[in-house]
Design a protein with these regions (language model features):
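Generic signal for short, ordered secondary-structure residues
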Residues: 12, 19, 26, 89-90, ...
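Short, solvent-exposed, charged loop/turn and helix-capping segments
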Residues: 82-97
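Short, flexible active-site recognition loops that position polar ligands and cofactors
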Residues: 140-157
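Short secondary-structure subsegments characteristic of cysteine-rich extracellular domains
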Residues: 127-144
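Short, well-ordered coil↔helix boundary/capping segments
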Residues: 94, 98-108, 147
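Active-site oxyanion-binding pockets that recognize sulfate/phosphate
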Residues: 23-30, 94-97, 150
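Intrinsic disorder/low-complexity segments enriched in polar/small residues
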Residues: 79-80, 132-133, 148, 155
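Amphipathic alpha-helical interface elements
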Residues: 2-84, 102-109, 113-124, 156-180
Length: 182
């Protein structure tokens, strides 16, 4: 009887330890990815400010502080406006980097699920080795995200950041799409 109770206590302690490891890994993923996307949002806010307020530092400050960084101006809205600008003013860049920039919507969806989803600490998740991933209940029905998959998401976010750096350099110029000879 005592050994059964002792076994139950040990199993419970193992589950608690497994849950701690899962939550630690989830915090690590969330922290890294949400920070990356926050930097992307900051860069887009600066690009939009520079685009719409080119010559007046006072207007730039007002636009940045009171419009583009406010909660009503969501990251999704910023992204949509940026995509329209790139398509309209930098069509050659858009053609070359359309795939990368189009992945932005996937990044936002992943970011939102990561930020707002509960961590899966079901018995199945607690029994799974941590190297097989961490599940978030609202992301693909709790399917675990492995380190490799997470790294792929980070690469996508870094590619978006690189594109934003390019777009910042393009801002003073407007591309003219070359007509193809027929």
């Amino acid at each position: 009887m005592l050994t059964n109770r002792r076994r139950e206590v040990v199993e419970e302690q193992e589950k608690i330890q497994a849950a701690k490891l899962i939550h630690e890994k989830a915090r690590y993923y969330r922290g890294r990815f949400l920070n990356s996307v926050a930097c992307i949002e900051h860069d887009i806010a600066h690009i939009l400010t520079e685009y719409f307020c080119t010559s007046d530092p006072g207007k730039r400050k007002i636009f940045y502080s009171n419009i583009v960084t406010r909660a009503f101006f969501s990251l999704n809205r910023k992204k949509d406006i940026l995509m329209k600008i790139v398509q309209a003013d930098y069509p050659l860049y858009w053609e070359e980097y359309r795939e990368v920039l189009s992945a932005f919507q996937e990044i936002l969806e992943f970011r939102n699920k990561l930020a707002h989803s509960r961590v899966d600490v079901s018995d199945e998740a607690l029994d799974r080795p941590i190297k097989e991933g961490v599940g978030f209940t609202d992301w693909k029905d709790g399917r675990p995200i492995t380190e490799e998959e997470f790294n792929d998401w980070e690469v996508k976010a870094n590619m978006i950041s690189s594109c934003l750096t390019d777009i910042k350099r393009l801002l003073p110029y407007k591309q003219v799409k070359q007509a193809v000879d027929q």
